[in-house]
């Protein structure tokens, strides 16, 4: 399942992301963070970390440097 998620993120980064203006307030970007989470922790924890990160991505959060731990 992790490989499928990584594949879908790669599709997003290659075809959808270039059509949008840059809007991620974090470094690394949410998609890069998610790919790293799936590669490092597998499907379940990777999904948990991805959802947690995406829920922080809103105008009221300061963003900034937020590496995968």
UniProtKB/Swiss-Prot annotation:
Keywords of this entry: Cell membrane, Membrane
Source superkingdom: Bacteria
Topology of the protein relative to the lipid bilayer: Peripheral membrane protein
A family per Pfam: YidD
Function, in words: Could be involved in insertion of integral membrane proteins into the membrane.
GO CC, any one term: plasma membrane
Family to which this protein belongs: Belongs to the UPF0161 family.
Keyword Kinase: no
HAMAP family: UPF0161_YidD (MF_00386)
Subcellular location: Cell membrane
Entry protein name: Putative membrane protein insertion efficiency factor
Sections of the chain in a coiled coil: none
PANTHER family, sorted: MEMBRANE PROTEIN INSERTION EFFICIENCY FACTOR-RELATED
Chief localisation class: membrane
């Amino acid at each position: 399942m992790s490989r499928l998620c990584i594949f879908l993120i790669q599709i997003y980064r290659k075809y959808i992301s270039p059509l949008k203006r840059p809007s991620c307030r974090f470094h690394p970007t949410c998609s890069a963070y998610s790919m790293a989470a799936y590669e490092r922790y597998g499907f379940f924890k990777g999904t948990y970390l991805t959802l947690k990160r995406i829920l922080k991505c809103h105008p009221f959060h300061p963003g900034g440097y937020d590496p995968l731990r």
